[in-house]
């Protein structure tokens, strides 16, 4: 799999590329990454990538032309590898990112992560070049880099070979439409709180049953919307 990020702040992606599971997966060749700075696709001496919005208002907007040129360069390089790009833009107006969508996107051969800044991007560029808009939630961030990092991390951990224990991804929250169950490690008693006895029983069927019940309990208490959705999907 290949990720290409169109971003003014490529160094932010070091958080994924240099640490943990995503670093090991990169070292194992499970995915590739390349960043593209829109400033490299400008003509003026100041490498301008933003301007004032028509109609007035606060802040600046990213210009369409440098982003369009950057995306053309990405597309050309991907075409040389017979890869078709899927361009994702991160925006509060996008559809909320879910584990189901992560699982679908991980099968894409090439994702282009378009990271906006300032007050956003000229709408004409979005209409012409973007395949999908994604949101992490109903809040505003300073740019698209953090959502892009979150998406990369979520996808990479699902790639075969990324996790040392293949069952870890299958047990993640949302993988079965529910929150994950509670987990415990040593010592058996910590500050007067003991590990549930069933987890020490060695009875795998009982442990699996307990974990499923706990997932249902937590989901019902903390995210009843997920439980309703899972029940609806099961009926259909």
Curated annotation (Swiss-Prot):
Compartments reported by the entry: Cytoplasm
Keywords: Cytoplasm, Methyltransferase, S-adenosyl-L-methionine, Transferase, tRNA processing
GO CC list: cytosol
Gene Ontology biological process terms, A to Z: tRNA N1-guanine methylation
Residues where S-adenosyl-L-methionine binds: 116, 136-141
Molecular-function annotations in GO: tRNA (guanine(37)-N1)-methyltransferase activity
Protein origin, superkingdom: Bacteria
Alphabetized Gene3D superfamilies for the sequence: 3.40.1280.10, tRNA(m1g37)methyltransferase, domain 2
One Pfam family matching this protein: tRNA_m1G_MT
Principal localisation: cytoplasm
Reactions mediated catalytically: guanosine(37) in tRNA + S-adenosyl-L-methionine = N(1)-methylguanosine(37) in tRNA + S-adenosyl-L-homocysteine + H(+)
Signal peptide: none
Top-level EC class as recorded in UniProt: transferase
The keyword Hydrolase belongs to this UniProt entry's keyword annotation: no
Enzyme Commission number(s) of this protein: 2.1.1.228
InterPro entries xrefs: Alpha/beta_knot_MTases, tRNA_m1G_MeTrfase_C_sf, tRNA_m1G_MeTrfase_TrmD, tRNA_m1G_MTases_N, tRNA_MeTrfase_TRMD/TRM10
Subunit structure: Homodimer.
Family the entry assigns: Belongs to the RNA methyltransferase TrmD family.
Described purpose of this protein according to its UniProt entry: Specifically methylates guanosine-37 in various tRNAs.
Family annotation (NCBIfam families): PRK00026.1, trmD
Name under which the protein is recorded: tRNA (guanine-N(1)-)-methyltransferase
């Amino acid at each position: 799999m290949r990720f290409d990020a169109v971003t003014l702040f490529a160094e932010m992606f070091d958080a994924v590329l240099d640490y943990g599971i995503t670093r090991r997966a990169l070292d194992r060749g499970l995915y590739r990454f390349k960043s593209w700075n829109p400033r490299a696709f400008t003509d003026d001496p100041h490498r301008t990538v933003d301007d004032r919005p028509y109609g007035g208002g606060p802040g600046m907007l990213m210009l369409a032309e440098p982003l369009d040129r950057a995306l053309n360069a990405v597309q050309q390089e991907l075409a040389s590898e017979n890869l078709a790009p899927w361009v994702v833009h991160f925006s509060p107006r996008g559809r909320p990112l879910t584990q189901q969508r992560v699982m679908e996107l991980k099968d894409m051969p090439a994702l282009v992560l378009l990271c906006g800044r300032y007050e956003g991007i000229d709408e004409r560029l979005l209409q012409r070049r973007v395949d999908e808009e994604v949101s992490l939630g109903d809040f505003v961030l300073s740019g698209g880099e953090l959502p892009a990092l979150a998406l990369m991390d979520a996808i990479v951990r699902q790639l075969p070979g990324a996790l040392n224990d293949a069952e870890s991804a299958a047990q993640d929250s949302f993988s079965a439409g529910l929150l994950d169950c509670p987990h415990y490690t040593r010592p058996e008693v910590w500050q007067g709180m003991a590990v549930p006895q069933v987890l020490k029983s060695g009875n795998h069927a009982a442990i699996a049953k307990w974990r499923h019940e706990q997932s249902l309990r937590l989901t019902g208490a903390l995210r009843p919307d997920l439980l309703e959705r899972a029940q609806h999907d099961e009926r259909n």
